[in-house]
Amino acid sequence: MKVFAAALAVILATATFCTPASASPYASDTTPCCFAYISRPLPRAHIQEYFYTSSKCSIPAVVFVTRKKRQVCANPEKKWVREYINTLEMS
């Protein structure tokens, strides 16, 4: 039982003091990084806005923000992504 309690304490301490993997390692840059892209287009009507990830991220990405404030990473080289960006810029 003591081993279990000690292990639980270590896990909780680690979880408390570690930052999520998507957080930026640079204090002045709060843009999240993407590590994978969505495999298919989102419904255009669900997207409210977009932004590009930082150049400090390992892969370039466009992050679409849905009406429910969900952030989805997309490949900026895909045709549907460029079309969605153009549509959002026009509106």
Swiss-Prot record:
Main location group: secreted
CDD domains: Chemokine_CC
Domain of life per record: Eukaryota
GO biological process: antimicrobial humoral immune response mediated by antimicrobial peptide; chemokine-mediated signaling pathway; eosinophil chemotaxis; G protein-coupled receptor signaling pathway; inflammatory response; positive regulation of cell migration; regulation of insulin secretion
Keywords from the named record: Chemotaxis, Cytokine, Disulfide bond, Inflammatory response, Secreted, Signal
Segments passing through the bilayer: none
Pfam families per the UniProt record, alphabetical: IL8
Paired cysteines (S-S): C33-C57, C34-C73
Cell compartment(s), UniProt: Secreted
Gene Ontology molecular-function annotations: CCR chemokine receptor binding; chemokine activity
GO cellular component: extracellular space
Signal peptide region: 1-23
Family, as annotated: Belongs to the intercrine beta (chemokine CC) family.
Task of the protein: Chemoattractant for blood monocytes, memory T-helper cells and eosinophils. Causes the release of histamine from basophils and activates eosinophils. May activate several chemokine receptors including CCR1, CCR3, CCR4 and CCR5. May also be an agonist of the G protein-coupled receptor GPR75. Together with GPR75, may play a role in neuron survival through activation of a downstream signaling pathway involving the PI3, Akt and MAP kinases. By activating GPR75 may also play a role in insulin secretion by islet cells.
Protein's name according to its UniProt entry: C-C motif chemokine 5
Organism of provenance: Equus caballus (Horse)
Gene, per the UniProt record: CCL5
